[in-house]
């Protein structure tokens, strides 16, 4: 049976690991160290570690794999194949070249578009109507290896980064399992990425999280769904942060300054730069838990006036 080392960290990687383990001999799992999570900073294992332990697979958690003692241990396992999916570290050539069949990665974009750590976010932020998964060879340069297989999936108006993560995770697992038999048999010729079509999906900055109400409504709508459920787009209300977790887009055009609110007893609409409307559905005022807009308008939202503007 083919011996595989799997490397991954977030929930995205779990279905891929589980599918691999159902058919192949996963001899080791490498993931990031446990990290403090939440306000109480509780030390929490990555989702992949939890899944690996349930599957009784040995787990390695080096802080920096390149300089760790675990690197030589992994090379000594003499795996047939290394598979990664959102692991989170650049791997050294000594490891990439050690398995018989090399090292491959499951990446959540249609490469060469969106190399980097936030491909799903950027597909939503840019208003794409489709994205997908690419399986490619691992090289030391970020997401630059030759492509082995690729599969597309639509992005709907109702999708956000969270829903697309779930869909792409399942798609990645399916594509990997469909690809591996021919790949291991040497029947697939990989295709080089077109350097002229390369784009990057760098980690989201704090500046990208803040809503600029002078932007067109469609741009703001894509920002909100592209940053949900993490890190969440925000604006300000009376100079305090106000997160918008979920919203819809209304292309009806109205007169008014960007950021101006239109409201009734149960709903809230905000005028964007082109006069179209953002309709928040799930929000989080400063110091409060997230809530639906109806609950907000039945409480603190009753104090808003039509002269109130977001972002001031």
Curated annotation (Swiss-Prot):
One of its GO terms (molecular function) is methionyl-tRNA formyltransferase activity. SUPFAM superfamilies: FMT C-terminal domain-like, Formyltransferase. Its EC number is 2.1.2.9. One of its GO terms (cellular component) is cytosol. It catalyses: L-methionyl-tRNA(fMet) + (6R)-10-formyltetrahydrofolate = N-formyl-L-methionyl-tRNA(fMet) + (6S)-5,6,7,8-tetrahydrofolate + H(+). (6S)-5,6,7,8-tetrahydrofolate binds at residues 109-112. The keyword Thylakoid does not apply. Keywords: Protein biosynthesis, Transferase. Belongs to the Fmt family. Attaches a formyl group to the free amino group of methionyl-tRNA(fMet). The formyl group appears to play a dual role in the initiator identity of N-formylmethionyl-tRNA by promoting its recognition by IF2 and preventing the misappropriation of this tRNA by the elongation apparatus. HAMAP family: Formyl_trans. This is Methionyl-tRNA formyltransferase. It comes from Listeria welshimeri serovar 6b (strain ATCC 35897 / DSM 20650 / CCUG 15529 / CIP 8149 / NCTC 11857 / SLCC 5334 / V8).
């Amino acid at each position: 049976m083919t011996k595989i080392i799997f490397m991954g960290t977030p929930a995205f990687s779990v279905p891929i690991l589980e599918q691999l383990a159902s058919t192949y001999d996963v001899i080791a799992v490498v993931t990031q160290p446990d990290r403090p999570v939440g306000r109480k900073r509780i030390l929490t294992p990555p989702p992949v570690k939890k899944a690996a332990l349930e599957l009784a697979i040995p787990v390695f958690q080096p802080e920096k794999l390149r300089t760790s003692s675990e690197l030589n241990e992994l090379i000594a396992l003499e795996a047939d194949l290394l598979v990664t999916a959102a692991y989170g570290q650049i791997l050294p050539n000594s490891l990439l070249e050690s398995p018989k069949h090399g090292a491959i990665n499951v990446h959540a974009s249609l490469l060469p578009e969106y190399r980097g750590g936030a491909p799903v976010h950027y597909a939503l932020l840019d208003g794409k109507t489709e994205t997908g998964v690419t399986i490619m060879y691992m090289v030391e340069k970020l997401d630059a290896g030759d492509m082995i297989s690729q599969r597309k999936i639509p992005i709907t108006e109702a999708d956000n980064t969270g829903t697309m993560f779930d869909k792409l995770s399942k798609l990645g697992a399916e594509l990997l399992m469909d690809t591996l038999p021919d790949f291991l048999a040497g029947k697939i010729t990989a295709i080089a990425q077109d350097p002229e079509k390369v784009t990057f999906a760098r980690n989201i900055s704090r500046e990208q999280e803040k809503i600029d109400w002078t932007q067109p409504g469609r741009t703001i709508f894509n920002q909100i769904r592209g940053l949900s459920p993490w890190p969440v787009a925000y604006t300000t209300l009376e100079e305090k942060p106000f997160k918008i977790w979920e919203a819809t887009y209304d292309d009806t055009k109205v007169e008014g300054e960007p950021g101006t609110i239109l409201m009734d007893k149960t709903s809230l609409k905000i005028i964007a730069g082109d006069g179209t409307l953002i309709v928040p559905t799930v929000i989080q005022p400063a110091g409060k838990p997230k809530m639906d807009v109806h609950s907000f308008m039945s409480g603190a939202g009753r104090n808003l006036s039509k002269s109130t503007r977001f972002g001031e």
